[in-house]
């Protein structure tokens, strides 16, 4: 296995790690319901993307309610 020939100095180590940083996700506001959502993603509250309804949230809510009734 390959090994480094010399130890990395503190300054070189810092320069190496300078580009290793986390970026915050791009959060925007949904134009339909004004809830926060990730950009380029459908809204998880109202199910719209780019002005169109792509997820039927009423059907999902009904399915969830039926499932919870069956467990009780």
UniProtKB/Swiss-Prot annotation:
One of its GO terms (cellular component) is large ribosomal subunit. Pfam families: Ribosomal_L32p. This is Large ribosomal subunit protein bL32. NCBIfam families: rpmF_bact. Keywords: Ribonucleoprotein, Ribosomal protein. SUPFAM superfamilies: Zn-binding ribosomal proteins. It comes from Dehalococcoides mccartyi (strain ATCC BAA-2100 / JCM 16839 / KCTC 5957 / BAV1). GO terms for biological process: translation. The keyword DNA-binding does not apply. It comes from the Bacteria. The keyword Protease does not apply. Belongs to the bacterial ribosomal protein bL32 family. GO terms for molecular function: structural constituent of ribosome.
């Amino acid at each position: 296995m390959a090994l480094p020939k010399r130890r990395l100095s503190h300054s070189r180590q810092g320069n190496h790690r300078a580009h290793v940083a986390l970026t915050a996700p791009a959060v925007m506001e949904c134009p339909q319901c004004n809830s926060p959502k990730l950009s380029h993603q459908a809204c998880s509250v109202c199910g719209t993307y780019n002005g169109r309804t792509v997820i039927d949230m009423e059907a999902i809510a009904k399915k969830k309610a039926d499932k919870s009734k069956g467990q009780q």
